[in-house]
Each structure stands twice: as structure tokens, then as C-alpha cells.
């Protein structure tokens, strides 16, 4: 039963790992990441939706590691850019992944677009896959509404956080504390939905 108290987060992004660890710290649950399994290669994200990518990663890695795996696929959806960068958020400016280059590209494409027309949302799809073949993956999602700023603000977070304005706090996402961000973030909301859906033995309750 000991391995039931462990979950692998399917990412090497330490910003995401910290968010998962903070959100799960009240449970008797050990959070590991792909950094703990250096021999495992990240799964190529070939899905056309956030949900498809999350399930693809969780299912593949769960079978490889024989472990419970949480995978998320998340990104930024900007209305004025017809939904871009969307599922390509991490590589919007091309390879290799570069947060600053991605931000620069979004700001460039929104140049001269008025603030009230820069509505956007963060979207997160979370999938949990189990090594037992008879258990279907659990899938949930969460969103966070906001606007795209004209320039970076704040030092916290990662990804597009410095240009994402949260009206509730009147701050950029990167200006929020971890607790503030977890309360309203797309990933935080998805994880709270996940808590209601995953089996009791997974949470160790």
C-alpha cells in the first residue's frame, strides 16, 4: 500500500511541480516529478486539445512507471488571437521552449489592441492514470479569466504569468503569492475538482 501514497506529476517544469506539491501538502501523499525518473522521456504532445494531451501523457507514463500519474496540459487562450497560443502555448515562439520568447510573441501580436479587447484565460486539463488496466483515467479541467497586459509585471510564477492580469486582485498573476494564485488559478481549480473525483485510497483518507 505504500506506493498508493505516491503520485508522479508528469512534468519537469519545477514551477508546476511546486504548485502540485503545495496543493497536495494537506494529504498524506508524496509528490514526485519526472526529475526523479531521468531514464523516462517526456511524451510527445500530439493531441489537438488540452484534454487529449493530458490523457496521452498520463496513460503512457503510468504504464511505463507502473505508478499513479497526474498529467496536465495547460495553456493560454487569447480571444483576440482566435484562441492562440492554445495547445501550443509552451512552444508558441518555437523550439526550444522559452517563456520570455513566448511572452514577447504574444505582446507583439497584440500590439495596438486595446486593453478591453485583450481578454484571455488560462486553461488546464488534468488527467490521472492508474497502472491497473481496468481503471479509466480521471479527467477534469479548470479556467482562470483575465486580460493580457501590455508589459510584464511581477517576479513570481512562470510561463505567461507576468502578462496575465487578474481582475479579482487587480494584479498580474506573477504578482500574486502562492496562496493567492492557488485560490484562483486554472490549475488550482482543476485540482480541487480532482479531489472530489479521485478514489479515496488515492488520497489516503
Curated annotation (Swiss-Prot):
Residues reported to bind substrate: 11-16, 74, 158-161, 181, 186-187
Name the UniProt record assigns to this protein: dITP/XTP pyrophosphatase
InterPro entries cross-referenced by the UniProt entry: dITP/XTP_pyrophosphatase, ITPase-like_fam, RdgB/HAM1
Any one GO cellular component localisation term in the record: cytosol
NCBIfam families the record matches: PRK14822.1, RdgB/HAM1 family non-canonical purine NTP pyrophosphatase
Protein role: Pyrophosphatase that catalyzes the hydrolysis of nucleoside triphosphates to their monophosphate derivatives, with a high preference for the non-canonical purine nucleotides XTP (xanthosine triphosphate), dITP (deoxyinosine triphosphate) and ITP. Seems to function as a house-cleaning enzyme that removes non-canonical purine nucleotides from the nucleotide pool, thus preventing their incorporation into DNA/RNA and avoiding chromosomal lesions.
UniProt xrefs under PANTHER family: INOSINE TRIPHOSPHATE PYROPHOSPHATASE, INOSINE TRIPHOSPHATE PYROPHOSPHATASE/HAM1 PROTEIN
Amino acid at each position: 500500500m505504500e506506493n498508493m501514497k505516491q503520485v508522479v506529476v508528469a512534468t519537469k517544469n519545477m514551477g508546476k511541480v511546486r504548485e502540485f506539491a503545495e496543493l497536495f501538502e494537506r494529504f498524506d501523499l508524496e509528490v514526485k516529478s519526472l526529475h526523479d525518473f531521468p531514464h523516462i522521456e517526456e511524451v510527445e504532445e500530439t493531441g489537438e486539445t488540452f484534454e487529449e494531451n493530458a490523457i496521452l501523457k498520463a496513460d503512457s507514463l503510468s504504464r511505463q512507471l507502473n505508478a499513479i500519474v497526474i498529467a496536465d496540459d495547460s495553456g493560454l487562450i487569447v480571444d483576440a488571437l482566435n484562441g492562440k497560443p492554445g495547445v501550443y502555448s509552451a512552444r508558441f515562439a518555437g523550439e526550444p521552449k522559452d517563456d520570455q520568447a513566448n511572452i514577447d510573441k504574444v505582446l507583439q501580436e497584440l500590439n495596438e489592441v486595446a486593453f478591453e479587447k485583450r481578454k484571455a484565460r488560462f486553461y488546464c486539463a488534468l488527467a490521472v492514470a492508474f497502472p491497473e488496466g481496468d481503471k479509466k483515467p480521471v479527467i477534469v479541467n479548470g479556467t482562470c479569466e483575465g486580460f493580457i497586459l501590455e508589459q510584464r509585471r511581477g517576479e513570481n510564477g512562470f510561463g505567461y504569468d507576468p502578462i496575465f492580469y487578474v481582475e479579482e486582485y487587480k494584479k498580474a498573476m506573477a504578482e500574486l503569492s502562492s496562496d493567492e494564485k492557488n485560490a484562483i488559478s486554472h490549475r488550482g481549480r482543476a485540482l480541487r475538482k480532482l479531489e472530489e473525483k479521485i478514489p479515496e485510497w488515492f488520497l489516503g483518507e
